[in-house]
């Protein structure tokens, strides 16, 4: 898939948005992680990288033993079209892993106008858009941030909402899901345990 991605980068405006490789990014191999977390910002790379909260949570998660957090940003229209034309799923910046292969897909909801981008990112990444359509092999989709205080508009698409300060509980959530994977718990059991965590 790497060669196909390189080819489409030649066709899009601002290909640096999708290249990654910045200093201080996560370096643990994807296959060696006990649990993988796709940190999704439903806006372009430029907006995402100007957001301090994303950098803080990225650092917190990658400091947890066995956890790998990678970033995924909303592609611009030209890249969306190229991904669809070439049948390439939306991928992470660090390892270019398709969104659907992560254990956890986490969205930060900073403003309501980004809600449609959440749905676009799920669809582009090969993750069933509706929570009810997800099976045992699909990621657990969570969302936090200021707009998570009103989960109703996205409740049909998100498995669990983090209401409150993400810095306080994101480590607990990720470690819980890591342990659930070790115990081979079902999706329903995992979500049941998540529901018991206080926001």
Provide a role label for each language-model segment.
Residues 74-199:
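Glycine-rich beta-alpha loop elements in corrinoid/cobalamin-binding modules
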Residues 35-37, 43, 48-52, 56-64, ...:
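General detector of N-terminal leader/presequence modules that precede the first folded domain
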Residues 33, 65, 137:
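Residue-level signal for beta-strand positions within conserved beta-sheet cores that form or flank
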Residues 20, 27-29, 38-41, 103:
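Flexible, glycine-rich loop/tail regions that form catalytic "lids" or insertion modules at the edges
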Residues 22-32, 95-97, 191-192:
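Short boundary motifs at domain starts and secondary-structure transition points
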């Amino acid at each position: 898939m790497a060669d196909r991605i390189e080819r489409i980068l030649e066709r899009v405006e601002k290909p640096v948005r999708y290249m990654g490789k910045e200093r201080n990014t996560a370096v643990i191999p994807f296959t060696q992680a006990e649990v993988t977390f796709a940190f999704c910002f439903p806006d372009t790379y430029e907006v995402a990288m100007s957001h301090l909260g994303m950098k803080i949570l990225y650092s917190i998660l990658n400091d947890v033993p066995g956890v790998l957090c990678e970033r995924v940003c909303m592609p611009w229209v030209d890249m969306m079209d190229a991904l669809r034309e070439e049948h390439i799923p939306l991928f992470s910046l660090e390892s270019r892993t398709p969104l659907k292969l992560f254990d956890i897909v986490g969205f930060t909801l900073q403003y309501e106008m980004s809600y449609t981008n959440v749905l676009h990112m799920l669809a582009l990444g090969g993750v069933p858009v509706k929570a009810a359509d997800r099976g045992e092999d699909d990621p657990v989709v969570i969302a936090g941030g200021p707009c998570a205080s009103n989960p109703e508009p996205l409740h049909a698409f998100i498995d669990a909402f983090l209401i409150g300060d993400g810095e306080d509980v994101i480590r607990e959530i990720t470690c819980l899901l890591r342990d659930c994977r070790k115990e081979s718990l079902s999706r329903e059991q995992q979500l049941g345990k998540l529901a018991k965590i206080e926001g």
